Regions:
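Acidic-and-aromatic substrate-binding clefts and catalytic sites of carbohydrate-active enzymes
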Residues: 73-79
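C-terminal catalytic domain of photolyase/cryptochrome flavoproteins
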Residues: 9, 13, 235, 254, ...
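N-terminal beta-strand-loop-alpha-helix module at the start
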Residues: 1-72
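Short helix/loop capping segments that flank catalytic or ligand/cofactor-binding pockets
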Residues: 15-18, 37-39, 249, 279-281, ...
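Beta-rich, aromatic/charged-enriched effector core domains that present basic-aromatic interfaces
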Residues: 80-226, 407
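A short acidic (Asp/Glu
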Residues: 16-19, 39-41, 79-82, 107-112, ...
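Well-ordered alpha-helical segments embedded in enzymatic catalytic cores
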Residues: 52-55, 80-84, 349, 353
Length: 497
């Protein structure tokens, strides 16, 4: 057993075995008003973090790791996390601490600067939250002016020898089975129910604390659908493998009205706070897939989410996040009205996705990308405003997740640093991938889509992959064009500032 003193953040709830392996015998943990309020985080996100931290305290103590834990009730509202930590270290006469890599760049900078000024030595350990080290991403992306997930993913598969045959070729003959993952869910296919987790002994206390301190944050606390400890997170993964994994691939991009989780694993919240780690998730997934003959499009699609997208996004964030977060390629400047926070915009699928988000603090990637952020972008909303909304509304949100996803993928605000084209769509795509009914909303969304295309005609004409769009725009019936453009203008007036 080592004797190292670790500072553990609320997003670093790693297996105690990892701490012990790194020589940890004692930790500092603190709930913090500043970290709870730097965005108006969804109430369920606060619940996940605060309950998860207290459950983790118990887990560490059961593993004979000494825990110095400060609950919110013992903290002064105006005092920062770092100031409080430095006071504690002085009191304990500690001049050296250990910590896992901090993913949030601004907080990392504040933390290291303050501790240096206080003459505290900080030893930084590689984060188990990711498979690759930060500098590995740099070497894999060396010399590139633009970044592409597909080339990163291929290198990752080769480096890790995952889904590779004996000749060094991808199993199944291709790197991605994404084309097989675009079916809508038929009426006779019922997605399985989510498992119900045992309520945490801290549940009621934390709910009261949130209502008393953060009642103006979005969302409600009714549907605590997720686990808040390691055993529960592992159970969630096991349940996905047993009842959802087989159909995950084929229906990965599908949407259903008033249904949320479908065939998705829903483990991103637990990966993003350390209750699960990607190395173990991949190992368990591949073992299960081999034993149970899971279809290749499901296996590859899930592996791509974990070792492709997730690692790629983190790498982009540390290399280019500072630049991305200042970018605004389309020069959008509009702000969101309250309708985006209560689901009353008047576009049916959008309102359904917002209401689901308020209820669950979660929705899978297609509604996030092709419904919510797509429509925000088509309306000319400032990417910083879109980023803020996503940070506030999801329990799996983090700066490292949302900066590349919003400024890169969702809005193309970075001008194509990590994607070849903006992800925009009209009503056709949404109808094709879902059971949403046709309605008045279709004209509004189509108007937004074609209006955006017309406004950015030069961009589309200069891109060989997209030039076809302007030709389709020019073929629009003038009467229909006027009608849908008017609907779009009315929508923008009513739902943006």
């Amino acid at each position: 057993m080592g004797s190292k003193f670790f500072v553990i953040l609320g997003s670093q709830l790693f297996n105690p075995k990892i701490l012990k392996k790194n020589g940890c015998s004692e930790v500092y943990m603190a709930e913090d008003f500043g970290l709870c309020t730097y965005f108006k985080h969804h109430k369920l996100k606060l619940y996940l973090f605060l309950t998860g931290m207290r459950e983790y305290r118990d887990e560490l103590e059961n593993e004979s790791i000494s825990v110095n834990y400060f609950e919110l009730s013992s903290r002064k509202k105006g005092e920062s996390y770092v100031d409080s930590l430095i006071k504690f270290l002085k009191k304990k006469n500690l001049s050296e601490i250990n910590i896992f890599e901090i993913e949030d760049k601004a907080f990392e900078e504040e933390f290291l600067k303050a501790l240096k000024a206080a003459n505290v030595t900080v030893n930084i350990f590689q984060s188990p939250m990711f498979i690759f080290e930060r500098n590995e991403f740099v070497s894999m992306a060396k010399g590139k002016k633009v970044y592409r997930m597909s080339s990163f993913y291929q290198k990752a598969r080769k480096n890790l020898d995952i889904l590779m045959d004996e000749n060094g070729k991808p199993v199944g003959g291709k790197w991605s089975f994404d084309e097989d993952n675009r079916k809508k869910i038929p009426k006779n296919v019922e997605p399985p129910e989510m498992i119900v987790f045992k309520k945490s002994k801290y549940a009621e206390e934390i709910k009261k604390l949130i209502i008393n301190n953060f009642d103006d944050h979005p969302g409600d606390l009714e549907n605590t659908w997720f686990p808040v400890n390691r055993a529960g997170a592992e159970k969630q993964l096991d349940n996905f493998l047993k009842v959802r994994f087989e159909n995950f691939g084929i229906y990965e991009d599908a949407m259903l009205e008033e249904k949320n989780f479908l065939f998705h694993s829903c483990i991103s919240p637990f990966l993003n706070i350390g209750l699960l780690t990607p190395d173990k998730v991949i190992k368990k997934t591949l073992q299960y897939a081999e034993k149970n003959n899971v279809p290749m499009n499901s296996v590859e699609g899930f592996v791509r989410q974990i070792i492709g997208w997730r690692e790629f996004i983190r790498g982009i964030y540390h290399e280019e996040g500072a630049l991305q977060s200042k970018s605004n390629y389309w020069k959008h400047s509009k702000k969101l009205t309250s309708s985006w926070y209560d689901g009353t915009t008047g576009i049916d699928p959008l309102d359904d996705c917002i209401k689901t988000t308020l209820k669950d603090g979660y929705i899978h990637h297609i509604p996030r990308l092709m419904v919510i952020s797509n429509i925000m972008n088509l309306c000319g909303v400032d990417p910083k405003e879109i980023y803020k909304w996503f940070m506030e509304m999801y329990i799996d949100s983090s700066d490292w997740v949302m900066v590349p996803n919003v400024f890169g993928m969702a809005t193309y605000a970075d001008g194509g640093m990590m994607s070849t084209k903006p992800y925009t769509c009209g009503s056709n795509y949404i109808l094709k991938m879902s059971n949403y009914k046709k309605g008045d909303w279709c004209d509004t969304l189509d108007g937004l889509y074609w209006k955006f295309t017309e406004k950015n005609r030069k961009f589309y004409e200069n891109n060989p992959r997209l030039a076809l769009l302007t030709r389709s725009l020019d073929r629009l019936n003038p009467e229909r064009k006027n009608h849908i453009f008017k609907k779009a203008e009315d929508f923008i007036k009513q739902n943006t500032i």
